[in-house]
A protein has these predicted regions:
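Catalytic nucleophile loop
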Residues: 125-128, 151-170
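Catalytic-core regions built around general acid/base machinery
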Residues: 141-154
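N-terminal secretory signal peptides and thylakoid transit peptides that target proteins
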Residues: 1-15
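Portal/gating segments that form or line small-molecule/metal binding sites
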Residues: 82-134, 139
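C-terminal and late-domain segments of enzyme folds
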Residues: 35-70, 78, 85-92, 96, ...
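C-terminal segment of N-terminal export signals and the immediately downstream linker at the start
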Residues: 22-42
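Hydrophobic h-region of N-terminal signal peptides that target proteins for export
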Residues: 16-22
C-alpha cells in the first residue's frame, strides 16, 4: 500500500486516496452529534505511557507542560481500560507518575456519582489498557457525552494509548482484542480522523503475520473516506481550539514533514 504523506506528521498518515479499488460500500456509521468547540479547548493525544526504556509517563513532562501550562490541576482519572489488576493500583501508578509534575490524580471510581465527577472536573485524564473495555465501561457509566461536552468547552484532556484512541471519532483503529462489546463504536471525536497508537512500521523478522500497515490498509479499503495517523511510541498530538493540531514528542521521535 502506498502511504500518503501530508504536512501534519512524518510518523505515518495513511490516506484514503491510496485505496481506490471497487468494493461493497461500508455500512453507514451513526455520526456524532455536532457540538460547539471552545477556542480554549486543549487535548493531548499520546501514543504510549512509555518511550524506549523510560519509566511510566516520565518522558512526557514537556507534553504535560504544553497542555496544562504552569497551572497545577486536580485531574479526574478514568481507569476503565484496566482489565488485569485493580483501579486502586492503577490510580496509584498514575498518581506517582504525575506527582513530579505537580498535579493531583483522583480516580473516578472514588466517586459515587461518576457523572457528577465529570461535570465538576477541572481536567480529565484517560489511561491506557484495553480500548474495548474502556469504551464499554464509559458507556455503562453514562459519561461519554459528558466528557466530550466538558472537553469541548475547554477542560484540559490527556489520554495515552487507549485513552488517546478514544479521542478519535471511533475506536475502530485500536490494536486491542475486542473483549467487550460497547453499544456503539463512537467515542469522543476531538479530532476528525483516526489514530493508531504504538505504531510500528514493517513486520517482525522471521514472522509471517500481517503488519500494522496491513491492518490499517484493510480499514482504509473498507472506509474509503477515512484517514488514519500512525503514532509511534513517544509521539503525541496536541490539539487546540477546533482542529489546530501539532505533533510533539521526544527529540528523536518522528516530527512534522
Amino acid at each position: 500500500m502506498a502511504l500518503t504523506r501530508r504536512n501534519l506528521i512524518s510518523a505515518t498518515i495513511l490516506g484514503a486516496a491510496a485505496v481506490a479499488a471497487p468494493m461493497a460500500p461500508a455500512k453507514q456509521k451513526t455520526p456524532l452529534k455536532p457540538m460547539k468547540v471552545s477556542p480554549k479547548r486543549r487535548v493531548l493525544i499520546q501514543s504510549s505511557s512509555r518511550y524506549h526504556n523510560s519509566g511510566y509517563l516520565d518522558f512526557a513532562g514537556d507534553q504535560y507542560e504544553k497542555l496544562f501550562g504552569k497551572e497545577k490541576y486536580e485531574i479526574l482519572f478514568i481507569p476503565y481500560a484496566k482489565v488485569a489488576g485493580t483501579y486502586d493500583a492503577y490510580e496509584k501508578q498514575v498518581q506517582d507518575a504525575f506527582k513530579p509534575y505537580g498535579h493531583k490524580i483522583v480516580s473516578i471510581h472514588r466517586f459515587k456519582d461518576p457523572k457528577k465527577a465529570v461535570r465538576e472536573a477541572k481536567a480529565i485524564a484517560v489511561g491506557g489498557g484495553n480500548t474495548w473495555a474502556l469504551v464499554t465501561r464509559m458507556y455503562e457509566a453514562g459519561i461519554i457525552d459528558l466528557i466530550r461536552e466538558r472537553v469541548n468547552a475547554g477542560v484540559p484532556y490527556c489520554g495515552w494509548s487507549a485513552g488517546g484512541n478514544v479521542a478519535c471519532p471511533t475506536l475502530r483503529t485500536t490494536n486491542d482484542m475486542p473483549i467487550a462489546e460497547p453499544p456503539s463504536f463512537n467515542t469522543f471525536g476531538f479530532i476528525p480522523f483516526q489514530t493508531n497508537p504504538h505504531f510500528i512500521s514493517g513486520g517482525t523478522q522471521g514472522l509471517n503475520n500481517e503488519t500494522r500497515e496491513d491492518r490499517l490498509e484493510e480499514f482504509l479499503w473498507y472506509n474509503k473516506d477515512e484517514e488514519v495517523i500512525g503514532l509511534p511510541e513517544g509521539t503525541a498530538l496536541f490539539v487546540t481550539g477546533e482542529y489546530d493540531c501539532e505533533v510533539i514528542g521526544p527529540k528523536d521521535s518522528p516530527k512534522r514533514v
